């Protein structure tokens, strides 16, 4: 009598499991960090519900510039795994969250435990628009969902009260702590709100050191993903104090296309290197002016900061043009309006995402330390 057993077809479909999805995600690498999502601990969900794959990935910054590429790579990897299992998917739903991580290695505990990353914005000379870059970098990161603080470290020439529209805001203290101002989606503090508006601070180095330390340590920052510190020009007391006082993740150096600005920016880069602070990149401010005729005018030369970045082996974080709107928005204390200008929005958004990417890489390497100052 013939057997009634009929073997299953070799090509019959098999269920796609969550374990198989996780294996597929091991082939997806974070383009900046250079490792796969599973090894980096970024995969928070990898479920399969019927014909839907549900995946949650925790990025290292809400301003991740590679989000779309990561999404595409995930979809390709999961679709490939489903095809191998002959499992038909109607949807691959990828959700992104973000957690700005502290560096892996630290020397001692941070004096600001609620602050995850501290970034200096500096320049070797004044007049290059360093504060403009610091303000719009902070606002740009906040627009991506990050919790951001901005500290005005320019003790002798504080400009953040004007650029953030803090003129009518009153300084509030609770006990020994100053309450930061909250405007444009960021927290901020400046010496300019603690002294008379027109008063000149004729202070020697130790007094400037003490004032900066008080602003940094006695402001109730709370929980922040990023604290941006707008440094004064030059390589003097405040940058040294900052590097010794706080564990910096890195620094952004601001330059114009002009040769004299490049010379001083080079000195700023060397200063940070001597302090053991990683330079995240160079940004070119005042790159060009667009006239009413629609033509671009290179008032200070062309591409000088990008060339400087290349010669020093540093990332170039982008170029910001001169526009009447940028000047007006800075003077009126409304940087949010810069995102209504397509050229400025593109420049500042690019600066924010590229800087966030560099911060994530620096934090993952975790190489920074509180420096030992040496003179050479």
Language model features by range: what are they?
Residues 2-44, 76, 80:
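N-proximal, solvent-exposed amphipathic alpha-helical segments enriched in charged/polar residues
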Residues 25, 43, 64, 78, ...:
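Residue-level signature of catalytic and energy-coupling elements of molecular machines
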Residues 39-42, 47-53, 60-122, 352, ...:
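Extreme N-terminal, non-catalytic leader segments
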Residues 81-82, 95-97, 102-103, 269-376:
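C-terminal lobe/tail of nucleotide-utilizing enzymes
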Residues 118-154, 265, 269:
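Walker A/P-loop phosphate-binding motif and the immediately C-terminal alpha-helix
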Residues 141-203, 209-217:
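Phosphate-binding loop that captures ATP/GTP phosphates
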Residues 195-242, 261:
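Phosphate-binding/switch loop-helix module in NTP-utilizing enzymes
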Residues 222-226, 247-268:
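Conserved Switch II/interswitch segment of TRAFAC-class P-loop GTPases
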